[in-house]
């Protein structure tokens, strides 16, 4: 009987201790004989406060992690693989600049193509013009003449007279109207030789020196004298000297 009482007393004083080897933890004491009230007084759940060293370590790790990597903004990274927003903006700006530059170059090329082409060029310091168009009033088909093969106005006028009035079958009727060779430069015939310069103005052939003429001529026209009256008046004596002067 005494043994049973002592055993019961020993059981009532039995304590259950819980602890962790991580250090510093408190033990929860639970008594069997306390009933519900005793359980509420002696028994409770372990929390982070019971392990101060562990909690401090986790807090320190969280703080160091937060300090080493700042929070990522949604506007900071776009696309995949990730591309910085500033780099994306740079790419967009470069593309826009490239498009604007291409449009500007295309516009310059179009303007350049629309400009009248200069038929003159220099070879070994000498002006080389090449072939230019020649038209005559009353003749539907035009011709071309090589200015490089001529050295003076007289030589050029003689070539054009032979071209339109002696070798062209379509001008037989015109040739029969004249009993003497045409004089395109002295104003003694029904026709006069004119040219269009690079500025688009029609001028009388022979009013400037030969070199200046071949640098500015675009095309020739054998025009009726009645239609050429509005052009600049010619000074016959100075022009005669310029026409006969070789290059």
From Swiss-Prot:
A Pfam family matched in the record: AUX_IAA
Motif EAR-like (transcriptional repression) positions after renumbering to this chain: 14-18
Sequence segments annotated as region (Disordered): 25-44, 49-119
Tissue expr: Preferentially expressed in stems.
Induction: By auxin.
GO MF: DNA-binding transcription factor activity; identical protein binding
Any one biological process term the GO annotation gives: auxin-activated signaling pathway
Keywords tagged on the record: Auxin signaling pathway, Nucleus, Repressor, Transcription, Transcription regulation
Compositionally biased residues, Polar residues: 87-98
Subcellular location(s) per record: Nucleus
Main location: nucleus
One GO term describing the cellular component: nucleus
Record's compositionally biased regions (Low complexity): 62-75
Gly residues: bias regions: 25-40
Compositionally biased intervals (Basic and acidic residues): 106-119
Family listed: Belongs to the Aux/IAA family.
Subunit relationships: Homodimers and heterodimers. Interacts with TPL.
Record text about domains: The N-terminal half of the protein contains two conserved domains I and II. Domain I includes a slightly degenerated ERF-associated amphiphilic repression (EAR) motif which seems to be involved in the activity of transcriptional repression. Domain II is required for the correct degradation of the protein through the SCF-mediated ubiquitin-proteasome pathway. Interactions between Aux/IAA proteins and auxin response factors (ARFs) occur through their C-terminal dimerization domains III and IV.
Function noted in UniProt: Aux/IAA proteins are short-lived transcriptional factors that function as repressors of early auxin response genes at low auxin concentrations. Repression is thought to result from the interaction with auxin response factors (ARFs), proteins that bind to the auxin-responsive promoter element (AuxRE). Formation of heterodimers with ARF proteins may alter their ability to modulate early auxin response genes expression.
UniProt name for this protein: Auxin-responsive protein IAA13
Organism: Arabidopsis thaliana
């Amino acid at each position: 009987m005494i043994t049973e009482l002592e055993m019961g007393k020993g059981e009532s004083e039995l304590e259950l201790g819980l602890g962790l080897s991580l250090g510093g933890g408190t033990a929860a004491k639970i008594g069997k004989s306390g009933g519900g009230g005793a359980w509420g007084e002696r028994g409770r759940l372990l929390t982070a406060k019971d392990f101060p060293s562990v909690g401090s370590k986790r807090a320190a790790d969280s703080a160091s992690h937060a300090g080493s990597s700042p929070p990522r903004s949604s506007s900071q990274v776009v696309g995949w693989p990730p591309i910085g927003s500033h780099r994306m903006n740079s790419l967009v700006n470069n593309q826009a600049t490239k498009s604007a530059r291409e449009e500007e170059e295309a516009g310059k090329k179009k303007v350049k193509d629309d400009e009248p082409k200069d038929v003159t060029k220099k070879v070994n310091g000498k002006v080389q013009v090449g072939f230019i168009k020649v038209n005559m009033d009353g003749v539907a088909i035009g011709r071309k003449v090589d200015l490089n093969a001529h050295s003076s106005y007289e030589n050029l006028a003689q070539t054009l007279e032979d071209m339109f009035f002696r070798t062209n079958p379509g001008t037989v009727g015109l040739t029969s109207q004249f009993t003497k060779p045409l004089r395109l430069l002295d104003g003694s015939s029904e026709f006069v030789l004119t040219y269009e310069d690079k500025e688009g103005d029609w001028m009388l052939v022979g009013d400037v020196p030969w070199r200046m003429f071949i640098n500015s001529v675009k095309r020739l026209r054998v025009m009726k004298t009645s239609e050429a009256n509005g052009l600049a008046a010619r000074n016959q004596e100075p022009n005669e000297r310029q026409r006969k002067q070789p290059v």
